[in-house]
Every structure is written in C-alpha cells, then in structure tokens.
Amino acid sequence: MTPSTLPIDQYDAQLAEKTGRLKAMMASYHAPEPQVFRSPVSHYRMRAEFRIWHDGDDLYHIMFDQQTKHRIRVDQFPVASELINRLMPALLNALRPHLTLRRKLFQIDYLSTMSNEIVVSLLYHKTLDDEWRQQAIALRDQLRQQGFNLQLIGRATKTKICLDHDYVDECLPVAGKQMVYRQVENSFTQPNAAMNIQMLEWALSVTEGSKGDLLELYCGNGNFSLALARNFERVLATEIAKPSVQAAQYNITANQIGNVQIIRMAAEEFTQAMRGVRQFNRLEGIDLASYRCDTIFVDPPRSGLDEETVRLVQEYPRILYISCNPETLCANLATLTQTHRVSQLALFDQFPYTHHMECGVLLEKRT
C-alpha cells in the first residue's frame, strides 16, 4: 500500500486475517463468535495530517515511508474522505501565490465530516502576525467561494489563530435518529465515521432493554454517552480534556438530551471519588449515591485500563468495553473474566489495510 493507492482487492483477505487473529486472542476467555463490521474500502478516514515540502515557489503534501523514511509526494489520498481529497489541491493552489502564507508552513491538518464541514489547521515554524491573518482571511474566503464549508486555523509555537471557530459539527444517522456531534480541532474524534455509526448501533443493540443508569469513563465529546442515553434512565460520564467536555455539553443541548451529566475529571480521580477516598469540588451538587449504574462503559486509550479502574469496573453487573488495542483488552480481561463472562464480541474494521483492530465486548457478571 502507498499513500496514493489502496489494495482494495485484498480487503476481504485482510479482514479475514484480523477476524482470525481476534478469535485466537479471545479463545481463552471463551468469547462467542465475533460480529464483524466492515469499513468502506476507500475514503473512510475523516481526518488526515500531512507534512509540507517546499520546492522553490512550489509546495506539496508529503508523507514519510515508515520503513525507509523517504518522503513521498501525496497529491491524492484515497484513505481520506472525498472532501479532504477535493480540498487538498484547491488549498495548495490558493496558497502558492502568497509568500506570507507559504513561508515556514510545515504541516497541514484536515478534519472533515459527513455533513461536508471541514476545519484546516496550518502549522508554522514562525511568528504569525497581522499580515498573516489578513492573507488567511482572504484564503478562507476564496475557498468558501469555491464551495468549501471551511474553518481555517493558524498554529505556531504557543500561538493559535482561529479566524472563526475551531470546530465542525458532524451529523450521524444512528439507529433511526440524527445525532449532532461537535468535533473540536486537535481533540480526539473517531477517525472512521462509517465505523463509528456501526459501533454506536452495536452498543445500542447490546444494551437494549437495560435497567438503571449508565456510567461512562473517557467519554470524549459524548460520542457514546449521547447515543446510549435512550437505553438508560440516566447517564453519568467523565472526561478530563476541557475542549472535549465543552463539546460534550454543546452536544447534549444540540441533541435535546436531558438525562446525561458530564463531569470533568480523570477516570482515576472518579475511582477515588466513588470509593470515598477523596472529595472533589467538581462533584458539588452531584449526588453520586443516587445513581444506580448497573452498566459501565469504557473506551480507554491504547494503554487500556489501569489496575485500580479494572477493580472499579468489576463492581458493575455489566461492562461494555470498546478497545482500540486488543492486546491491552486481553490483559484487562485476564482480571475481568474472574468475575464476568464475555457475552458479546464485535470486530470493527476502523483501520483497514493496517495491523490495527478495534473491538467491543460486553461482559456480564457471573452468577
């Protein structure tokens, strides 16, 4: 695979290999057959980052070969959304005549949506001044006249210039409802929107008919919390990143959801609060004891759950666990399956043509 070509004819084979690998990893935990969710074979990634190479008055996107470290010119990138591919040449054509915008530009980041909004971040090794801002405004307006619903941001060391705002609003059809998600530049969002929809719908299906409340750790912008709210009486969710918390609060309002409460704190801190080890001012006005959470949802970073959080989640009758790293999931399952059994397993091909897998498990307490 190169940046400009995809081995689409090998898609089924690579998915079968991942399925077999996941089944082998999960065999010792007596997991059921996985449900397998396919990705679109191209234009599936909603964000992309490119370094910029300057050649005299010309410039172009590049990536680096992971083995040889050689640079590769990238004019089209079929991994990324069609919107990103349309904007890539249009943006460079608009940049070339403007030395102020070109000079010391070393990276361009794109974040697109299925709702055809896109935010572009231009990263520089220089100070950004008023002249840069004026030319950036002209660049933004020129691209908008070409039909791009675009937000433009300039970044340099300790500097962020946002011409309008630094987010896009995604709209996803999830199990018969349109869900609005504000996605903030430089914050985590699910990269494969089509797979995100399938993950949300799978999570809804395996929690259908739930009783009581839901606790979510690592909620981000509320991606899962808000979709799952329809299956629970109340949802209590934690997130540490301030921009993600702000986006989640907006998303609660935009989706007119009244049963979700977001708390800004780390999962480790929340564990301490639940155990009564520490008191936090951030929890003032929130009666943790009033929640009857029979289900806990976790979508941790690649490192998985720390030991203390594993012990916390074991206290809940049902654990819904989304993992972007099955190896750390299995490490956690070695402990979790002492008290719970794996009742559902899913493979989401979030990262086609790569070694990486995303999977989901539902664990239910042994009787």
Curated annotation (Swiss-Prot):
Matching CDD domains: AdoMet_MTases
Location of the active site: C324, E358
GO biological process, one term: tRNA methylation
Pfam family, one: tRNA_U5-meth_tr
One Gene Ontology term of the molecular function aspect: rRNA binding
The EC number(s) this enzyme carries: 2.1.1.-, 2.1.1.35
Catalysed reaction, written as an equation: uridine(54) in tRNA + S-adenosyl-L-methionine = 5-methyluridine(54) in tRNA + S-adenosyl-L-homocysteine + H(+); uridine(341) in tmRNA + S-adenosyl-L-methionine = 5-methyluridine(341) in tmRNA + S-adenosyl-L-homocysteine + H(+)
Coiled coil: none
Residues binding S-adenosyl-L-methionine, per UniProt: Q190, Y218, N223, E239, D299
Gene Ontology CC annotation, any one: cytosol
Keywords: Methyltransferase, S-adenosyl-L-methionine, Transferase, tRNA processing
Entries under Gene3D superfamilies matching the protein: 2.40.50.1070, Vaccinia Virus protein VP39 (3.40.50.150)
Function recorded in the entry: Dual-specificity methyltransferase that catalyzes the formation of 5-methyluridine at position 54 (m5U54) in all tRNAs, and that of position 341 (m5U341) in tmRNA (transfer-mRNA).
Family: Belongs to the class I-like SAM-binding methyltransferase superfamily. RNA M5U methyltransferase family. TrmA subfamily.
Protein name stated in the entry: tRNA/tmRNA (uracil-C(5))-methyltransferase
